[in-house]
């Protein structure tokens, strides 16, 4: 059922209730502390507690598994959760996507669904997950899985592209409380998937080199990416993802990193998810109740930023120290914090705690 832009599923009321209850609980009692330990031990504990029938996105109210959260967690979660568990999650998402005919944004232990709406990054992160398993274990998709992935990729390319780039009709992505038309982030995810496809035995209509050229021509502005097709505003998540995956030449990545630093988006905590407030046309009514959420520092994106800088050989010691400070202060891996380091909170939404992709990105940063 559709309600405006929202996909209304049986899980939606539960998610709203969990978010609101957690916001009030944190407002009254603060963030409940996890068992004491070093930042790495706290991160590992969060992953283990979230690893149930599906790898829940968090401990407080994200009691589902988003495909993109899972994909961004893989590099850091591998040693803690193991190939058997993570591989089982990859296989479950693949089989369920085959049943649905597309890759939904979210899963519980029973089925896949979209929440709060379909997203353009789901298929790419499932493809990335298969690629990461291949790199880690040498296990390529078997014939059945490869056939499923080929069908899913065919559907993705047929429905998501227009004129060689992600269509403006595709407005959902990981920042899933705003609707960015043809977000540069979604285009970078498509580039990631096209780069992964050949090693998995998949055939694609497009190719990575051509799409990379289109992205640079359409979205690169000399020292930054613009956020989406309808704006010239600087994109933080596009810079971070490009660094993390090494999607472009080093000269471009260096300029993108320098601009993020010059804008002080990684201060006082790494990293603000948006350089400027989102255009009102991209912000649905319910999101306007939590407008400060997108001006907070999102620590999973911050850890990914630091991992990208680390791959470029830059000093990440000060940034990691700030993450350590927050983890030890709250006794948890948080999702989003205000300038004073307190957890973001509104009447209906609070920062998640024990956030899977933040914990995993931190462990990747720590080299564990």
Set out the residue ranges of the language-model regions.
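Amphipathic alpha-helical repeat scaffolds
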Residues: 44, 71, 75, 241-244, ...
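Structural helix-adjacent loops and short alpha-helical linkers that scaffold large soluble proteins
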Residues: 31-36, 77-90, 133-150, 197-212, ...
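Aromatic-rich carbohydrate-recognition surfaces in CAZymes
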Residues: 63-163, 187, 296-306, 316, ...
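Short beta-alpha connecting loops at secondary-structure transitions
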Residues: 109-113, 286-291, 341-351
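Low-complexity, Ser/Thr/Pro/Gly-enriched N-terminal "stalk/linker" regions
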Residues: 2-65, 85-92
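Generic long, charged, amphipathic alpha-helical segments
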Residues: 270-298
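C-terminal hydrophobic structural anchor segments
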Residues: 298, 302, 306-333
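Catalytic cores of carbohydrate-active enzymes
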Residues: 18, 25-26, 30-37, 41, ...
């Amino acid at each position: 059922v559709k309600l405006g832009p929202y996909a209304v599923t049986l899980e939606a009321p539960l998610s709203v209730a969990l978010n609101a209850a957690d916001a009030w609980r944190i407002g009254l009692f603060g963030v409940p502390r996890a068992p004491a330990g070093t930042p790495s031990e706290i991160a590992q504990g969060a992953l283990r507690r979230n690893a149930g029938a599906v790898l829940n996105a968090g401990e407080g109210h994200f009691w589902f598994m988003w495909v993109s959260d899972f994909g961004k967690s893989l590099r850091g979660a591998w040693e803690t959760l193991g190939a058997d568990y993570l591989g089982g999650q990859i296989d479950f998402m693949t089989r369920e996507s085959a049943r649905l005919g597309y890759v939904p944004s979210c899963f519980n232990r029973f089925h896949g669904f979209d929440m709060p709406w379909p997203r353009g990054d789901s298929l790419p992160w499932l493809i990335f997950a298969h690629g990461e398993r291949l790199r880690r274990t040498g296990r390529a998709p078997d014939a059945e899985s490869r056939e499923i992935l080929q069908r899913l990729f065919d559907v993705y390319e047929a429905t998501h592209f227009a004129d060689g780039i992600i269509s403006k009709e595709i407005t959902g992505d990981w920042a899933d409380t705003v609707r960015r038309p043809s977000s540069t982030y979604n285009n970078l995810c498509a580039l990631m998937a096209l780069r992964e496809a050949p090693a998995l035995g998949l055939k694609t209509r497009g190719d990575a080199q051509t799409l990379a050229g289109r992205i640079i021509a359409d979205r690169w502005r000399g020292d930054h990416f613009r956020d989406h097709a309808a704006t010239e505003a600087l994109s933080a998540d596009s810079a971070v993802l490009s660094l993390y995956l090494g999607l472009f030449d080093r000269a471009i990545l260096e300029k993108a990193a320098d601009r993020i630093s010059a804008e002080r988006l990684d201060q006082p905590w790494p990293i603000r998810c948006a350089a400027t407030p989102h255009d009102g046309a991209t912000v649905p009514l319910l999101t306007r109740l939590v407008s400060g959420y997108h001006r907070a520092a999102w620590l999973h994106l911050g850890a990914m930023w630091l991992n990208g800088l680390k791959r470029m050989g830059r000093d990440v010691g000060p940034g990691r120290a700030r993450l350590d400070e927050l983890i030890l202060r709250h006794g948890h891996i948080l999702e989003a914090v205000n300038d004073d380091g307190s957890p973001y909170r509104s009447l209906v939404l609070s920062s998640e705690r024990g956030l899977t992709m933040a914990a995993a990105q931190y462990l990747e940063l720590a080299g564990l």
